[in-house]
């Protein structure tokens, strides 16, 4: 607001022109705005990392909302009775190119792959006759966990949890793939996606490569990522000769979250894993799959 001239005697104080003061204040506010927005939006996100849900209707609403926002991967277990309530959201996710792994629990023994309720809802569908928790993870970042009683009964004191935390979601995915998925029975597997295609979700890459291999059409891949031994950037180009996975039968992975490619390159075979890979040669960030025309 003022300019202080303390290098002269006596010290003088001069008021700055109002237009100049306003311009400086406006400039300072504009400079502060991004930092303030980030700070307070971060606090808001942290406050919303966990939400307690007390009603079946809200659980279904949260599932639909998360499915609508899915960009790369969905893992869902839901009862056969509730499946029709989220069928459209699941089908939309599949149409967007999202990998959808679905377990239908509390399913009738005569449920088959041609049932209209299952049409277009997932890349892989498994069923389990027993009741199990409703569990959803989306993009390994957010999801919902609900006990069976909350969806079965209108009056119960059981509660569900919705979460948005990148540290927790991979643990839930690991539990889904390690506990629920193996216990269920494979019912339907979608056809391979058209090529060429690019995936940032590595499990989707592995699924598509597996389906191509089993159809006698081994694909060619270009992998962008890093070498796991020295963290240096890596680019791997070659033909997929093997996959290790637990999504479709017969499975051949050694532990539940192991999903990898074995790529034959000009310099020999290279193993490729997804985010957090440590037993493979390369951790992939992006994979392009193409027909092998050689």
What are these model-predicted stretches?
Residues 1-294:
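Acidic, polar-rich N-terminal leader regions of halophilic archaeal proteins
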């Amino acid at each position: 607001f003022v300019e202080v001239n303390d290098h002269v005697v006596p010290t003088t104080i001069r008021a700055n022109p109002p237009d100049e003061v306003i311009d400086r204040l406006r400039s300072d506010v504009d400079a502060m705005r991004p930092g303030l927005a980030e700070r307070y939006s971060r606090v808001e996100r942290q406050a919303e990392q966990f939400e307690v849900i007390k009603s079946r209707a809200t659980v279904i609403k949260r599932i639909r909302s998360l499915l609508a926002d899915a960009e790369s991967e969905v893992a869902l277990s839901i009862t056969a009775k509730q499946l029709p309530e989220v069928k459209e959201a699941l089908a939309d996710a599949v149409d967007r190119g999202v990998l959808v792994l679905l377990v239908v629990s509390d399913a009738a023994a005569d449920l088959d792959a041609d049932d209209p309720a299952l049409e277009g809802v997932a890349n892989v569908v498994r069923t389990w006759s027993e009741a199990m928790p409703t569990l959803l993870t989306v993009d390994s970042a957010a999801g919902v966990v609900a006990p069976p009683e909350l969806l079965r009964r209108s009056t119960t004191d059981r509660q569900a949890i919705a979460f948005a935390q990148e540290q927790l979601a991979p643990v839930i995915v690991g539990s889904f793939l390690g506990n629920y998925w193996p216990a269920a029975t494979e019912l339907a597997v979608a056809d391979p996606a058209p090529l060429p295609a690019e995936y940032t979700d590595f499990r989707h890459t592995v699924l598509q490569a597996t389906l191509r291999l089993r159809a006698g059409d081994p694909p060619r891949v270009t992998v962008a990522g890093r070498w796991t031994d020295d963290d240096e950037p890596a680019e791997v180009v070659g033909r997929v000769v093997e996959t290790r996975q637990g999504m479709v039968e017969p499975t051949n992975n050694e532990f539940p979250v192991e999903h990898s490619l074995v790529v034959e390159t000009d310099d020999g075979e290279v193993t490729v894993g997804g985010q957090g890979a440590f037993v493979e040669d390369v951790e992939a960030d992006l994979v392009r799959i193409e027909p092998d025309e050689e």
